């Protein structure tokens, strides 16, 4: 079995693959202050609840956009699993040709998503990841990573609104009954959701203008389904795209792989 760990700024998603299939998955809050023992105890609890044992894990791969957490995670892997984890970064074989001014600037999450999307859906592609930041990645018909856009995520945009406006409350991110809000909460929900849908449609449309062939649009991340339900510009929602990319990259880098 393969343990895959995707560390985001807000959430960490953990999965277990068996024979190329995602068998188990969990989402936890990202904590920059957990020790290797706290991570180990947390994983032991998740494993025991699912009837898994640490001894069943034969490999581990991690992608992270939060560098401070990596020391504890790597120590946890060696202490509790007795495995040196693969870590997505420079020097790994991803099979991705990155046409960025400085390829090292491309986040691990964006690389992993692109690798999975190309293998699953072909190219050209636009991959939209609704995370703490919303990222847009364009892959051309030659499977080259050409670049993209980074925007504030819907959650931090919402937090900025109520934290900077004294009379506006903290609200749930949800679809209002009507775009024309009849109270403060529904008006905020309307502005946030439909404003964000407009952002997605606008950026995707402009990327398509520059594409030489019509790209397929793949969405992932916690709020992908909410946005996709309000827009016809998203072709496919794949909630486990990042985990699949980690599994693919692990296979490309494991000892003995040709």
Curated annotation (Swiss-Prot):
Residue positions of the active site: 109
UniProt GO MF annotations: ATP binding; metal ion binding; pantothenate kinase activity
Domain of life: Bacteria
GO cellular component, as recorded: cytoplasm
UniProt-annotated binding residues for ATP: 6-13, 132
Pathway assigned in UniProt: Cofactor biosynthesis; coenzyme A biosynthesis; CoA from (R)-pantothenate: step 1/5
Protein's job: Catalyzes the phosphorylation of pantothenate (Pan), the first step in CoA biosynthesis.
Protein name per UniProt: Type III pantothenate kinase
Biological source species: Bacillus velezensis (strain DSM 23117 / BGSC 10A6 / LMG 26770 / FZB42) (Bacillus amyloliquefaciens subsp. plantarum)
Lineage start: Bacteria, Bacillati, Bacillota, Bacilli, Bacillales
């Amino acid at each position: 079995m393969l343990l895959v760990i995707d560390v985001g700024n807000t959430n960490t998603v953990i999965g277990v693959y068996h024979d190329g299939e995602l068998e188990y998955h969990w989402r936890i809050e990202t904590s920059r202050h957990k020790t290797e023992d706290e991570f180990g105890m947390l994983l032991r609890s998740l494993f025991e609840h699912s009837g898994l044992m640490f001894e069943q894990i034969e490999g581990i791969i991690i992608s992270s956009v939060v560098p401070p957490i990596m020391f504890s995670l790597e120590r946890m892997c060696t202490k509790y699993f007795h495995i040196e984890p693969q870590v997505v970064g420079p020097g790994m074989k991803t099979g991705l040709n990155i046409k960025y001014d400085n390829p090292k600037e491309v986040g691990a999450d964006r690389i992993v998503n692109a690798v999975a999307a190309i293998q699953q859906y072909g190219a050209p592609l636009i991959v939209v990841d609704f995370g703490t930041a919303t990222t847009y990645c364009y892959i051309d018909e030659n499977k080259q990573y050409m670049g993209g856009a980074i925007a504030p995520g819907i959650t931090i945009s919402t937090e900025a609104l109520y934290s900077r406006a004294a009379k506006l409350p903290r609200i749930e991110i949800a679809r209002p009954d009507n775009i024309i809000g009849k109270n403060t909460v529904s008006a905020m929900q309307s502005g946030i959701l439909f404003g964000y849908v407009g952002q997605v449609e606008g950026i995707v449309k402009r990327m398509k203008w520059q594409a030489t062939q019509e790209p397929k649009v793949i969405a992932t991340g916690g709020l992908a389904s909410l946005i996709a339900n309000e827009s016809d510009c998203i072709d496919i929602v794949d909630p486990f795209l990042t985990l699949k990319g980690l599994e693919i990259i692990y296979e490309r880098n494991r000892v003995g792989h040709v």
